[in-house]
UniProtKB/Swiss-Prot annotation:
Protein name (database record): Large ribosomal subunit protein uL6
Origin species: Sphingopyxis alaskensis (strain DSM 13593 / LMG 18877 / RB2256) (Sphingomonas alaskensis)
Annotated keywords: Ribonucleoprotein, Ribosomal protein, RNA-binding, rRNA-binding
Domain of life the protein comes from: Bacteria
Function: This protein binds to the 23S rRNA, and is important in its secondary structure. It is located near the subunit interface in the base of the L7/L12 stalk, and near the tRNA binding site of the peptidyltransferase center.
Family: Belongs to the universal ribosomal protein uL6 family.
GO biological process, one term: cytoplasmic translation
MF-aspect GO terms: rRNA binding; structural constituent of ribosome
Length: 177
């Protein structure tokens, strides 16, 4: 029995949800998001809420129940508030600069790294060591953050690299003489 799946997803005012075909589409002040529906789950759009129930009592349906409810919640949160991830750059000479739909990274390579920002994502650099990634699709925001971080993951000796805000970097002691 899913404790998460039991709760209905509340739809705030200004947000509309509709099921058409095999898609659930949610429209709000920040935009429109859609997701394909699972055959193992029953979705019901009522007044002010979306409820998610397993279609049958199979193990797979019960396993998907809580996850599908959370995906629906992420759609509603995305079109109302949006999602943000913050990356921090540590290291001498490491910096970032957002220029329109392009992010220029200087990460200690012999060349600058140019990252093309996908549609639906907004990137800001409040200072040259902080990158703010925001958008309405939680999966896409996380994917873009992971792709940027992949260029220079934090190393365990000095902690140089790109890390998520709040991420703990396991540090190692250097060689002893």
């Amino acid at each position: 029995m899913s404790r998460i799946g039991k709760k209905a997803v509340e739809i705030p005012s200004g947000v509309t949800a509709a099921i058409d075909g095999g898609q659930l589409s949610v429209k709000g002040p920040k935009g429109t998001l859609a997701m394909s529906l699972s055959d193992n789950i029953k979705y019901e759009v009522g007044d002010g809420s979306i409820s998610v129930q397993p279609a049958n009592d199979s193990r797979e349906a019960r396993a998907f129940w809580g996850m599908q409810r959370t995906l629906v919640q992420n759609l509603v949160t995305g079109v109302t508030e949006g999602f943000t991830k913050v990356l921090e750059i540590t290291g001498v000479g490491y910096r970032a600069n957002a220029q329109g739909k392009n992010l220029k990274l200087q990460l200690g390579y012999s060349h600058d790294v140019d990252f093309a920002v996908p549609d639906g994502i907004e990137i800001k650099t409040p200072d040259n060591t902080t990158i703010e990634i925001s958008g309405i699709d939680k999966q896409q925001v996380g994917q873009v953050a992971a792709e940027i971080r992949r260029w220079r993951k934090p190393e365990p000796y000095k902690g140089k690299g790109i890390k998520y805000r709040g991420e703990y970097i396991f540090r190692k002691e250097g060689k002893k003489k």
